[in-house]
Amino acid sequence: YGTLVIDPKGGRPKADEMVMVQGGYNTTFDGQGNELYFVNGVPFAYMDRPIRVKKDQLVRIYLTNILEYDPINSFHLHGNFFEYYPTGTRLEPSEFTDTISQVQGQRGILEMRFPFTGRYMFHAHKTEFAELGWMGFFEVVQ
């Protein structure tokens, strides 16, 4: 899985950029739904190995939802807000929030700065998804 990023002609402000692909696995192949959920292919990966970012640095996330069986996915950030650019086709954000929802195949750009060091949890805002792997941490350092 991956994401194709096309920047606008003038570019975007310099940032620590990353791609997050949201999805799930149906491990029984029964067509009844997912048993595991993830960001970037591995359930719970960022719980044990948080994503390190620098305090006050602009962080840009290209977020893509490829989840099957479940029509809606979400991204929620604890302790901080972000600017959200749906589909990434505009240069001005549509929201300043801590939670967004995406339907299947939807994508968007999140931009944030962390004013304090420490760990900030992120996860799907559906408890089942979070409990089955779709959660992690940002580790904010000096």
Regions found by a protein language model. Give the residues of each.
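Copper-binding active sites and cupredoxin-like electron-transfer domains
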Residues: Y1-Q142
